[in-house]
């Protein structure tokens, strides 16, 4: 099972990624984790990445793809792998294809933006303990106050409505085009690569966590 998980921030990809990893016995490939591990290990690619990072520059797509290829050689990828958060852009997707990274499924978790804004902007947390609440779905017993300590709850900057909207705008511009890219490849194939086209699946990300999990498993049969 070689899989790319797509969906907007707040669509619940992380939660579903955990279910998929467990069911199929595959690792989740995180480019951030890979970069940190390569830099720490001092591998040639890691040293190259460190030069970019120390200069405050973005690591090039070419270097990230080489790190991905190196990571996929590890024994835990023998049964497949799951990409969540990569590729983010069409050039990255194209580079993956040209590098011969095989993908069986692209699974999109589809949630309307107004629902995502409601989900994320309603989160509240207790800073000291990390306990989280939601003003609509999981409210504290007393509004704005932690159940255990009676201390005030905060809204993280990441969860403020204007921040959520900005993140969704970036997603709309950079990552959403991947949906059309993979959909087109799945439907029409691509003679420029020997890779088999992936199957494209879209599921609704509305409902309970278990309902969405069942939809995901059904889509990946």
Curated annotation (Swiss-Prot):
One of its GO terms (cellular component) is cytoplasm. It catalyses: AMP + ATP = 2 ADP. AMP binds at residues 31, 36, 57-59, 85-88, 92, 156, 167. It is found in: Cytoplasm. Its EC number is 2.7.4.3. Residues 30-59 are annotated as: NMP. ATP binds at residues 10-15, 123, 132-133, 207. Catalyzes the reversible transfer of the terminal phosphate group between ATP and AMP. Plays an important role in cellular energy homeostasis and in adenine nucleotide metabolism. NCBIfam families: adk (TIGR01351), PRK00279.1-1 (NF001379), PRK00279.1-2 (NF001380), PRK00279.1-3 (NF001381), PRK14527.1 (NF011100). Belongs to the adenylate kinase family. This is Adenylate kinase. It comes from Paraburkholderia phytofirmans (strain DSM 17436 / LMG 22146 / PsJN).
């Amino acid at each position: 099972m070689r899989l790319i998980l797509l969906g907007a921030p707040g669509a619940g990809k992380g939660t579903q990624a955990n279910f998929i990893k467990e069911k199929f016995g595959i690792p989740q490939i995180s480019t951030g984790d890979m970069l940190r591990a390569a830099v720490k290990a001092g591998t040639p690619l890691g040293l190259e990445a460190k030069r970019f990072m120390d200069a405050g520059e973005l690591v090039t797509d070419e270097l990230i793809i080489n790190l991905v290829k190196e990571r996929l050689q590890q024994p835990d990828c023998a049964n497949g792998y799951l990409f969540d958060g990569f590729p983010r852009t069409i050039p990255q997707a194209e580079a993956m294809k040209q590098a011969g990274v095989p993908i069986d499924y692209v699974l999109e978790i589809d949630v309307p933006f107004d629902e995502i804004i409601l989900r994320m902007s309603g989160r509240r947390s207790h800073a000291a303990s990390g306990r989280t609440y939601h003003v609509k779905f999981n409210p504290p017993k007393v509004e704005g106050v932690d159940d255990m300590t009676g201390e005030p709850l905060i809204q993280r900057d990441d969860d403020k409505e204007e921040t959520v909207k900005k993140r969704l705008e970036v997603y709309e511009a950079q990552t959403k085009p991947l949906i059309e890219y993979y959909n087109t490849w799945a439907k029409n194939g691509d003679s420029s690569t020997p890779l088999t086209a992936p199957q494209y699946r879209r599921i609704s990300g509305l409902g309970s966590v278990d309902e969405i999990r069942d939809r995901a498993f059904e889509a990946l049969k």
